[in-house]
């Protein structure tokens, strides 16, 4: 019997005799508590919704295949990259960041770009965005970002004042804000945007030699974006425009592809790098650290059930494989805790047993975690009645020392170091990015900024103009004109008392 032909039962298999008429005392009487199907149906319904992600709540996803096209074994011994032509099953989830599950896809926002590779050495999660940088470089600010871009506690509305007050309080945010206000702030859809690992990671080879790397994913469909006006028209008729585009393209066999590249920096180069190479608000220039092709991935299968695969997909940067490692990037270090902890809250401690999260490349039957019990431990028989402690006489839970990573370079005493004393080069890179734009693209940055700052107080607008001017005088003048503010009325050389310097006092 096919699934389409199956007759209705309860969750424990009991046949349901009537799904349309409740059991009552007489034809018009009150309901009886012994109507077990009604009770079951409603109690299940009352619990259908799980907590949504605090960020990246609105998402779309698909399964696919990653294929190695170039040899990078001199940098890493990760088996996923071991030979040209090697293929690995994967899952990708794209998302907006600030909006809730019902948010419109065509909003001006960062896009999440999360990849899960089911390798033979375990799952590798690369949790990135469609931008190479972020708003700040210390994870202690992450909760504040969440609050600033989400709903105001009094009005329960998204508030541009909160948003821009926070962004302009952090001069290092200008790089990301410039990208967000540019044409790339609203991708046409998910297929026509690049992706970035954003953070600095590391690779090591069989000799234990470590290099620092950044991951890039360039769309093979080309870059296409939306103006504010076109995006507004799309949102008015289709709030799921990007999700619809991805799903329908895959359904008709028009499979999207991205090419994976890495940038490589040696440990010696990192020591001599002009800026902190682990600063998430900055990029590595391509002329100094060129893109090196690695492979490509193709998304070729839609999930059969959105909730099972997309909503329950759990990504965490702690899911990393031999041959790959972390870096001193403070934001990455913060996410090593936050992501897994959020998934355990949202999905439960055993969320790794959900099919989309299982280590398919290893096989669930071949893993041997030390964890036991917990809510919904169902897949691996809870390791049965065997030995559940270590050390023991059977060799169970023995370590695998052949997978030890090379020593991780660190230096200095533990202390709350002032990041602004270490690096205050906030404006060089956003200035270079601005100057790369065509004249028309610059004008759109000015207009988009003015649109986004509607309703924001003048003091915050002036703060943003000052930062833009420090990046490039033309940038500051253009934003000032779009906002209707006389740039000559602004002290362009100094910060006022409402800046980040005051926040730290």
Curated annotation (Swiss-Prot):
Q: Which GO terms describe its molecular function?
A: catalase activity; heme binding; metal ion binding
* Source domain of life: Bacteria
Q: Where is the active site?
A: 56, 129
Q: Which GO terms describe its biological process?
A: hydrogen peroxide catabolic process; response to hydrogen peroxide
Under the heading SUPFAM superfamilies, the entry gives: Heme-dependent catalase-like
EC supergroup of this enzyme: oxidoreductase
Cross-referenced InterPro entries, in alphabetical order? Catalase (IPR018028), Catalase_3 (IPR040333), Catalase_AS (IPR024708), Catalase_clade1/3 (IPR024711), Catalase_core (IPR011614), Catalase_haem_BS (IPR002226), Catalase_immune_responsive (IPR010582), Catalase_sf (IPR020835)
Q: What does this protein do?
A: Decomposes hydrogen peroxide into water and oxygen; serves to protect cells from the toxic effects of hydrogen peroxide.
The protein's name in its UniProt record: Catalase
UniProt source species = Staphylococcus aureus (strain MRSA252)
């Amino acid at each position: 019997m096919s699934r389409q032909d199956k007759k209705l039962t309860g969750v424990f298999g009991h046949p349901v005799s009537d799904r349309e008429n409740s059991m009552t005392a007489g034809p018009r009487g009150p309901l009886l508590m012994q109507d077990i199907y009604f009770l079951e149906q409603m109690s299940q319904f009352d619990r259908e919704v799980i907590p949504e992600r605090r960020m990246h709540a609105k998402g779309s996803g698909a399964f696919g295949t990653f294929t190695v096209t170039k040899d990078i074994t001199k940098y890493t011994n990760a088996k996923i990259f071991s030979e040209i032509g090697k293929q690995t099953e994967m899952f990708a989830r794209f998302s907006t960041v600030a909006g809730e599950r019902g948010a419109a896809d065509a909003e001006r926002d960062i896009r999440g770009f999360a990849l899960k590779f089911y390798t033979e050495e375990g799952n590798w999660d690369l949790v990135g965005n469609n931008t190479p940088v972020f708003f700040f470089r210390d994870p202690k600010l992450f909760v504040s970002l969440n609050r600033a871009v989400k709903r105001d506690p009094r009005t329960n509305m998204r508030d541009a004042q909160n948003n821009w007050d926070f962004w302009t309080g952090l001069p290092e945010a200008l790089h990301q804000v410039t990208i967000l206000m540019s044409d790339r702030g609203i991708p046409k859809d998910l297929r026509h945007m690049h992706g970035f690992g954003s953070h600095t990671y590391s690779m090591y080879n069989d000799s234990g030699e470590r290099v620092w790397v950044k991951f890039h994913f360039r769309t093979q469909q080309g870059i296409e974006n939306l103006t504010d006006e076109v995006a507004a028209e799309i949102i008015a008729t289709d709030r799921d425009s990007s999700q619809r585009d991805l799903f329908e393209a895959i359904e008709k066999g028009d499979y999207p592809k991205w090419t994976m590249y890495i940038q490589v920096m040696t440990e010696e180069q990192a020591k001599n790098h002009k800026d902190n190479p682990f600063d998430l608000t900055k990029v590595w220039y391509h002329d100094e650290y060129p893109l090196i092709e690695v492979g490509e991935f193709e998304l070729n299968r839609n999930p059969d059930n959105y909730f099972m695969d997309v909503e329950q997909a759990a990504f965490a940067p702690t899911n990393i494989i031999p041959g790959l490692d972390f870096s001193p990037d403070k934001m990455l270090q913060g996410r090593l805790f936050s992501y897994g902890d959020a998934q355990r809250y949202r999905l439960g401690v055993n969320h790794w047993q959900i099919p989309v999260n299982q280590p398919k490349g290893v096989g669930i039957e071949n893993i041997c975690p030390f964890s036991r019990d917990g809510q919904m431990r169902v897949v691996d028989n809870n390791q049965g009645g065997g030995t559940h402690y270590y050390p023991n006489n059977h060799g169970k839970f023995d370590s695998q020392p052949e997978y030890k990573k090379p020593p991780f370079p660190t230096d200095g005493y533990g202390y709350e170091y002032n990041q602004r004393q270490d690096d205050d080069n906030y404006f060089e890179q956003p200035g270079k990015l601005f100057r790369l734009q065509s004249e028309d693209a610059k004008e759109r940055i000015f207009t988009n900024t003015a649109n986004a700052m509607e309703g924001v107080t003048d003091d915050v607008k002036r703060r943003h103009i000052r930062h833009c001017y420090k990046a490039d005088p033309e940038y500051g003048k253009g934003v000032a004109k779009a906002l209707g503010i006389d740039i000559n009325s602004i002290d362009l050389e100094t910060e006022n008392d409402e800046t980040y310097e005051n926040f730290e006092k």
